């Protein structure tokens, strides 16, 4: 009998009812909520006269609609209603949640790990696709719909069909100036945005082992842009060190680690599909089009039109053409933030490049820490001063310009170097043009006024 993957082990431990191949009822260890996908779910509970089954396993924060310039001055009526409704709901149903502007408030996929709630062995859900971020800790983590949010609130369970298993091995040692954001963008560019459909992806290889927990979260975060249901990694000493000492870390930590150490894939585990990517010669990545798969290594020419891949429409929307390169893009905005790349390490990498320099004329740059703990830590290190002295705006935590649901929208027809995860049409604002890249690439572009090879700077 062959061994099991970490995904198999975790899934099987949480099955309450049902057979493999059909919907199975899973127990949920942590349910994280925010203001956008929870209002209808709470109203459903209210209408049915139900309560939240496990308030202690539920946790909320505000992120999507929160303004980052003046957090309490919410001009948009829908945004204000969602924030006010969330605050009312968590109070009424007795759910632990970060207050608007509170000490732990931030992007949902950042505050769960930072508080120590995210741990190996858990199944974690949230009404948000990038919940997969938590998989970096050796957890099953995936996004759910609003009706499922209500079901989990009421029962602490969810019905799911078990995905297939995919292993992706990142091999080699990257060059200086190449980061985990480049790993995942390269993977999506090579295999496509639907290559992971129907799979739970396990990331492995020496290139993964070498990454920090923050860098690992970046990769798991963008599993969704690869098309996967979720992404996860085997826990190791870096995982345990990250969790240790945090507010909600296990009280008997050594005992917890002894259990977590068993939650790794067996050497003879079987996968439905295996992919490999050598990162040793990988160059910094930049997207040119309107999905994350439309990306290239810096210096490569934009491809010829391929109607099967919607290239013609992408070129029209982005106002670019085949044969150009990333350095030809006329940038107007720089956004360093989002649940993909707004952690302390991301800000530190960007600040190293920015320090002593100034943002190029004609550019607008905003830096948005992903959470209040990150903001405080960055300010203690003086990173805020580095960015402000260079001409950047230093903002309050939130989802910000990752998506057009708050005031931080990129103006129409303006090209933005963005550390976020999606470059769809209108994602950052009506007719905004998004180019995904690492924080270091965004910082280098801010100084130069255009995309440059950050390997020549770091």
UniProtKB/Swiss-Prot annotation:
Binding annotation for [4Fe-4S] cluster: 339, 399, 402
| One Pfam entry name | Aconitase
- Enzyme Commission numbers on file: 4.2.1.33
Q: Which PROSITE patterns match?
A: ACONITASE_1, ACONITASE_2
Provide the family line: Belongs to the aconitase/IPM isomerase family. LeuC type 1 subfamily.
Describe the task this protein carries out.
Answer: Catalyzes the isomerization between 2-isopropylmalate and 3-isopropylmalate, via the formation of 2-isopropylmaleate.
What this protein is called in its record is 3-isopropylmalate dehydratase large subunit
According to its UniProt entry, this protein's organism is Lactococcus lactis subsp. cremoris (strain MG1363)
The gene is leuC
């Amino acid at each position: 009998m062959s061994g099991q993957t970490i995904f198999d082990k975790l899934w099987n431990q949480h099955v309450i009812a049902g057979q493999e191949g059909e919907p199975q009822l899973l127990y949920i260890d942590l349910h994280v909520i925010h203001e956008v996908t929870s209002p209808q779910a709470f109203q459903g509970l209210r209408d049915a006269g139900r309560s939240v089954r496990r308030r202690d396993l539920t946790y909320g924060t505000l992120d999507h609609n929160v303004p980052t310039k003046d957090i309490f001055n919410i001009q948009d009526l829908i945004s204000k209603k969602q924030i006010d409704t969330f605050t009312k709901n968590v109070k009424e149903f007795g759910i632990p949640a970060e207050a608007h502007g509170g000490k732990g408030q931030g992007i949902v996929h950042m505050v769960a790990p930072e508080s120590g709630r995210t741990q190996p062995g858990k199944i974690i859900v949230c009404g948000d696709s990038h919940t997969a971020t938590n998989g970096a800790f050796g957890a099953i983590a995936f996004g759910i719909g609003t009706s499922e949010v209500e079901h989990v609130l009421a029962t602490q369970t969810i019905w799911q069909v078990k995905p297939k298993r995919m292993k992706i091995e990142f091999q080699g040692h990257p060059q200086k100036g190449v980061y985990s954001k480049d790993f995942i963008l390269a993977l999506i560019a090579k295999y496509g945005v639907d290559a992971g459909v129907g799979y739970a992806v396990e990331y492995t290889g020496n290139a993964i082992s070498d990454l920090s927990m923050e860098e690992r979260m970046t990769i798991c975060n963008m599993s969704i842009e690869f098309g996967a249901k979720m992404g996860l990694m085997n826990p190791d000493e870096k995982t345990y060190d990250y969790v240790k000492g945090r507010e909600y870390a296990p009280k008997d930590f050594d005992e917890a680690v002894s259990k977590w150490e068993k939650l790794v894939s067996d050497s003879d585990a079987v996968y439905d599909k295996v992919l490999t990517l050598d990162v040793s010669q990988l160059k910094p990545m930049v997207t040119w089009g309107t999905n994350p798969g439309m990306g290239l290594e810096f210096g490569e020419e934009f491809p010829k039109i391929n109607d099967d891949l919607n290239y013609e429409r992408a070129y029209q929307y982005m106002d670019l053409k085949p044969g150009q390169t990333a350095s030809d893009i006329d940038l107007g905005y720089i956004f360093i933030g989002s649940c993909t790349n707004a952690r302390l390490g991301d800000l530190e990498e960007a600040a190293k490049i920015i320090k002593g320099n100034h943002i190029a004329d004609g550019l607008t740059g905003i830096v948005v820490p992903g959470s209040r703990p990150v903001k405080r830590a960055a300010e203690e290190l003086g990173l805020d001063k580095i960015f402000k002295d260079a001409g950047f705006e230093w903002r309050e935590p939130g989802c910000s310009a990752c998506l057009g649901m708050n005031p931080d929208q990129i103006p129409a027809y303006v090209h933005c170097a963005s550390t976020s995860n999606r470059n769809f049409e209108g994602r950052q604002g009506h007719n905004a043009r998004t180019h995904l890249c690492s924080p270091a690439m965004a910082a280098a572009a801010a100084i130069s006024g255009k995309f440059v090879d950050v390997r020549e700077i770091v």
